[in-house]
Amino acid sequence: MSNYFQEFDNKSVIITGAGKGIGRATAIEMARRGAKVIAMARTQSDLVSLQADIGCTTIKVDLSDNVAARAAMKQAGTCDYLINCAGTNVLESVLEMTEDGYEAVMGINLRAALICAQEFARARVASGGGGSILNVTSIAGHRGFKEHMCYAASKAGLEGATRVMAKELGHYGIRVNAVAPTVTMTELAAAAWSDPAKKDPMMVRHPIGRFANVEDVATAIVMLLSSDASMVTGTILPIDGGFLAV
């Protein structure tokens, strides 16, 4: 078994969406375990505070801009790991879905993740292979949630892409996996799920009896990047307290 607090020494990781939520928690956890973190986010103040906390390298970028996304990945250089955490949602019903909503969600959740993965993989192959990609998806890609039309499609699409990446990149020594969290209690989610009428029916569907916190997801991500998971690729790991099991 690896020593997590030594394994990531002298290793570098790109984390998109690192300013808030799961991305920020993962950046903190990877830095705590010795990794050099290159944090990407669109909000400068988030990057400034994260840099003050963990001493990371920061890149301010709007990943919905294809050209900017590729430029940011090239600026980051060849790294050992990529964690695609950047995500967004626009709540629209099937009948009210707009093209703008579709583009906003797909642009960040799917297209940007694929661009970042492609640039990361190209750099790894050019340097001799190896490394690992971790995509953050959602249980929304497995179950139908009201007003999550585009979000569900984007996350299911990223899971499909994860499997294709694992198949195509495996012989270069690059592992590709994903985690699929349930409701995760970021500051934004805590406010959204504060109403018991909304929260309680969802909570009861979790055998473990609670929603996830960002640390639950971050530590699972670290495990999948570690050498303890060296035989794991093409896997979608639910972080859901048993939600998908019932």
Model-derived features: where do they sit?
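Active-site helix of classical SDR
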Residues: A117, S154, T162
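Alpha-helical segment proximal to the catalytic Tyr-Lys
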Residues: R122, K167-H171, S230
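Active-site loop immediately N-terminal to the catalytic Tyr-X3-Lys motif
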Residues: L95, R143-M149, H171-Y172, G209, ...
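Residue(s) in the substrate-gating loop at a strand-loop-helix junction
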Residues: S138
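C-terminal substrate-recognition "lid" of short-chain dehydrogenase/reductases
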Residues: Y172-R175, R210-I239, F243-A245
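Conserved glycine-rich cofactor-binding loop
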Residues: G19-K20
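Substrate-binding pocket helix/loop in short-chain dehydrogenase/reductase
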Residues: S93-V94, T98-M106, M202
